[in-house]
Amino acid sequence: MKMNKLVKSSVATSMALLLLSGTANAEGKITPVSVKKVDDKVTLYKTTATADSDKFKISQILTFNFIKDKSYDKDTLVLKATGNINSGFVKPNPNDYDFSKLYWGAKYNVSISSQSNDSVNAVDYAPKNQNEEFQVQNTLGYTFGGDISISNGLSGGLNGNTAFSETINYKQESYRTLSRNTNYKNVGWGVEAHKIMNGWGPYGRDSFHPTYGNELFLAGRQSSAYAGQNFIAQHQMPLLSRSNFNPEFLSVLSHRQDRAKKSKITVTYQREMDLYQIRWNGFYWAGANYKNFKTRTFKSTYEIDWENHKVKLLDTKETENNK
């Protein structure tokens, strides 16, 4: 029988917000611009930029595809955002007796925003809408005259008139993708835990049982094990909750040629870590999940040179937000 000595959680004792931010040096790698002439109308310019936060274990890999189309009166940039966002997973202490906790990667957010007034707008993006598939796959195609098409799969929807195409392909087991804060200046996505199987599941971040609370990662309701050993095995947790998320998102930006030749964009990668805890009340185990308990955000700001089809990393910023 477990002793009925319960350790008060940090949630109950303090919900104060700790905000820590820092501006890192604007260091990164940018590849030389490669040029590909499709025909007498369309020329493609491609460069890749990387920026990392070693502190947060977040890596941004951005591929800039400039499309110069003589049959279209605007410049087009297809930006592919890839890289890595670590979950921030912290495993429980196996020696915890009647109360224990872990931190897990519950949601990953990516956004691309234009900092220009009206010269640069976001005109398309992928993926769109809500997507609960295990594997998300889209193909973007550009045809002469500025026509953009986005189709499901890695090749569907392309035809002989396609001057440029780009694909995205990522896995999100037990998670789902949502569009967020999307307008003509910003496109964003959130990949969040949705249906996690654990015995009586599926469970989510907000699941609740009147007796056992949120059993998201609880191994046994009546287990005689120590608290720190009464979580499901780490390998049974979804990969995104305990390891890394490898994003692949597309944004299409349009630039008016009669306006400023340079503009700025900001790319944001973020993880939301939830606090999950279990406690013994003398009769059974109960779990609780506290959403967005720790947030780690990494931003990079780039200057886009539309005339010369180049990019320059201006600044990076790391922000911590703890409850």
From Swiss-Prot:
State the family it belongs to.
Belongs to the aerolysin family.
Q: Does the keyword Signal apply?
A: yes
UniProt entry keywords in alphabetical sequence = Cytolysis, Hemolysis, Signal, Toxin, Virulence
Name of this protein: Leukocidin-F subunit
Which InterPro entries would you find in this protein's record?
Bi-component_toxin_staph, Leukocidin/Hemolysin_toxin, Leukocidin/porin_MspA_sf
Q: Which NCBIfam families match?
A: hlyII
**Organism, scientific name:** Staphylococcus aureus
GO terms, molecular function:
toxin activity
Top-rank taxon of the source lineage equals Bacteria
